[in-house]
Amino acid sequence: MSKLSKRQEEILAYIKDEVKKKGYPPSVREIGEAVGLASSSTVHGHLARLEKKGYIRRDPTKPRAIEVLSLGFDNDTFVKKETASFIPVIGKVTAGVPITAVENVEDYLPLPDHLAAYDNTYALVIQGESMIEAGIYDGDQVIVRQQQTADNGDIIVAMTEDNEATVKRFFREKDYIRLQPENSSMEPIILENCTILGKVIGVFRTIH
C-alpha cells in the first residue's frame, strides 16, 4: 500500500466522512475549505495522487465524481453506494410573485441515477408559498425537465411576458393562459402567452 502524506490522509478522511454522512462526495471547494487549502489546483493535485495510489477513482467529466475505492475504507466499514448523478442548481425561482430568472449554476444536486435519467434536467430553489397545496414549500428544490410544451394541469417553470420566471400549474384556456397557484388564498396569473422552460418532475427537501 502506498504511503500517504499527512495532507492526503486528511483529504481522504474528509471524503470518506462526507460519503458516509451524506451518501455523496464533497466538491473540490469543500475539500479545500475543510483542510485549509485555498488553491483548487492544489486540491486537484492531491486528488490525483490519491487516485494514482489506488484510494479513489474520479470521473473528470462529472462534478463531485469522486469514488472511494475499497482500499480507502477499513474492511468493516466499506459499503458500496448507489451511484449518483449531479444536476445543476441554476438559481432561485419564486412560487409567489414572479421574479427574474437566474441561470448561473450555483451548486450541484446529487440524485440517484434513476431519478436523473435526462441530460436536460436541472434544479431550482423555490421562494414563496403559492404552491404549498401541491406539497412544494419555500426553500424546496424542484427537479425540472427542460421542455417547451406542457399539458393542462402540469406544474411548470414559466417565463412570463415580462421575462420573469415562476412555478405554477399550467392551463391553456380558449383565449389566454392561466398560471394557477396551489394556494387557495392567491389569484392566478392570466397571460396572453408565456414561454415554458420546463416541467417540474420532482421535489427535493432537506429535513433539519
Swiss-Prot record:
It comes from the Bacteria. InterPro entries: ArsR-like_HTH, LexA, LexA-like, LexA/Signal_pep-like_sf, LexA_DNA-bd_dom, LexA_repressor, Peptidase_S24_LexA, Peptidase_S24_S26A/B/C. Residues 28-48 bind DNA. Keywords: Autocatalytic cleavage, DNA damage, DNA repair, DNA replication, DNA-binding, Hydrolase, Repressor, SOS response, Transcription, Transcription regulation. Coiled coil: none annotated. It is an enzyme of class 3 (hydrolase). Its EC number is 3.4.21.88. GO terms for molecular function: DNA binding; serine-type endopeptidase activity. Represses a number of genes involved in the response to DNA damage (SOS response), including recA and lexA. In the presence of single-stranded DNA, RecA interacts with LexA causing an autocatalytic cleavage which disrupts the DNA-binding part of LexA, leading to derepression of the SOS regulon and eventually DNA repair. This is LexA repressor. It comes from Shouchella clausii (strain KSM-K16) (Alkalihalobacillus clausii).
